[in-house]
Amino acid sequence: EFIARTKAAGAKGIRFYGICCSGLAAMYRYGGVIPLSNAVSAELVLATGALDLWVADVQDVFPAIMDVADCFKTTVVTTSESARLPGAIRCEYDHHHANIGETQALARRIVNMGIEAFTRRRGIPVHIPPYEIEAEVGFSLEYIAKRFGSIAPVAQALKDGRILGIVNMVGCSNTRVVYEQPTQVVTDILIKNNVLVLSNGCASFPLMKLGYCSRDAFTKAGDTLAQFLKPDLPPVWHVGECIDNARSSTIFGALAKYFGQDLKDMPFAFASPEWGNEKGINAALGFRLMGINSYHCVEAPIFGSKNVIEFLKHGTKELLGSSMNVNVSPEELANLIISDLKAKRVALGWAPTHAEAQA
């Protein structure tokens, strides 16, 4: 029905693109949704002039969205009562989702508005950067078991040092640092030192864009990690959207169980180089509660109390077995992570590196 209506309007069809975690969630659940960017560059995506309709839920509702959309006659629709934009069309659930039964009607209305916007926007200049890349996504404990037959091959590579350690690289982007640079730099140093990286949410976008999630990206990794990944596994395993941190924790948990060890004793780490909001603190604390250290290039936005920041940074070491580590230098932060992973290996009685294990 809608495809026919679209073609009658002169278009070839309907394409869906995604920003941030809403886009990743749709891609993972339905397919056919192409991820474009994380939240911070939302306006840049709009400024291509390529989008007929922009629909937002509770994220990416930035004030400048309407200014950019007006320049390109893009229709903006908000679907959350608590996240509206002046001038946007409201097509939303109420606060209690009492009208959840109207979902199909709301969706049909939005698609029709997109078709109308296409007709209205004829002649609008479009500039799409001439760059695209393929990324391998969908890693999970279940996929690992399917790919390798069990968790054992990954566990053995971890123990013998081919994989030095595993880091969950996540978090939002932050305008207080060079956009996406800390995430990319830390990741690059880690994989060159044979650390396997898991990623999801906003932090995964620069890693996808720069090829770290591509099947031939094992060439970016250190020798022993590349040996493990060949011929077609990337050094960064994409596990989903922001809330899919849970997939990383299940992978960590399965490996710890394989060795009969507590999570806090395993060579694992949580890195969120660019975090910049409350949910980032909560995500880090989720892993800290499991005894896994967190690492950041930006201080947590909790400076209302010196006692609170000192407790969250260092006071949790005895209580949880983990600490918060901050260094504004991505290079130094990456090296600290590597050093701490090696210390965990030594405490387990494992060689710090594969070369030392072979000696």
Sequence positions of predicted segments:
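Anaerobic metallocofactor- and corrinoid-dependent redox/one-carbon enzyme cores
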Residues: 1-359
